[in-house]
Amino acid sequence: MDTYFNTGGRYNPGTDSWTATSINNAPEGRSSHTAVWAGSEMIVWGGSATIFSLFNTGGKYNPNTDSWTATSITNAPAARFAHTAVWTGSEMIVWGGNDGNSGVNTGGRYNPITDGWIATTTVNAPDGRDGHKAVWTGSEMIVWGGIDFNGFFSNTGGRYNLGTDSWTATSNSNVPDPRTAHTAVWTGSEMIVWAGFNGFIGGFLNTGGRYNPGMDSWTSTSMTNVPDSRSLHTAVWTGSQMIVWGGDGQPGALNTGGSYCAQGGPTPTPTPTASPTPTSTPTPTATATPTATPTPTARATPTPGSRPTPPPRP
C-alpha cells in the first residue's frame, strides 16, 4: 500500500545541508499537489492520497518560524489533483486538474494575507484538463497541454488575465503536438514547452515550441543536439537558457539533460587589420587582432534512456 507523506525538508546549498520541516499542523500527506513561493512562505494546495481521497485543503509554511498555517476552505475550489498553480506577486492561482472523474476547467485565486478565495471565470476558459502546465507572465497566466476531460492528449491552451478575470485562447497555428507530462518555463517574453508524453504518436517526445503571447504565435524548438525523448522531467529558466534534466524515457529513468538557448547572438564581425604606415624610418604599425563575439549555441549530450513507461496517474 502506498504511503503519502506530509514531511519535507529545507536544503541550504551554501552549507550543503538539510533541515526537516515541522509536521505540527502540517497538511495531510498527499501527492500530485502544487506549491508556490509567496515571498516569505511556501503555499501547498490540493492533491490526492488515493483516487477516492482528494483534497481542497492546503497550508502555508513559514521557514523562518518552521511553522504551518492552514489555508481557508471557504470558497476554495473543489478538491482535485494534477492541477497547476502560479504565484502572481500577491495571489496564488490554481487551475484545472482532475476531480476523480475527469479534467476540470475551474480554478481559484488565493490571497494569503486575507486567507480568502475568489473563483476564476469559466467563460471562454480552456477545456477541462489535468497534467497540463502553467506559467505566470507578469500579467497573465498561460496554461497549455495536458489530458482533456474526454481523456485525449491536448495541444490547446489559454491566457488568463488577472485584472479582467477573462480568458483568451492560445493560437493553434504551428502549435506543438498534443502532450502531457511536459515542462513549461517563462523567459520574460515567451513560454517554452518541451518534451512530454503522447501515447498516440510514439510515446515519449523531445519536441517543443516557444509561444509568444504578444504575437499569439508559436515557433518550434530546434532538434539539433536535442536531448533524448522523455516525460516527467524538470526544467528551469536561468535568465538566458532553459535547462532540462532527468525524466522517464526509453528504456527507463534518465539522468541526462540539456540547455536550450531560445535566441542566438549576432554574427561575429572581425575587426579589419590595420595597414603599416611608412615613415622616414620604416616601422610597421602593429596589426590589430580581429575580435569576434561568439554566438551562443545550445548543446546537450543525449544518453539513451530505458523502458517506455507512460507517465503515472494517481
List each language-model region with its residue ranges:
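Ser/Thr-rich, Proline-interspersed low-complexity disordered segments
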Residues: 265-313
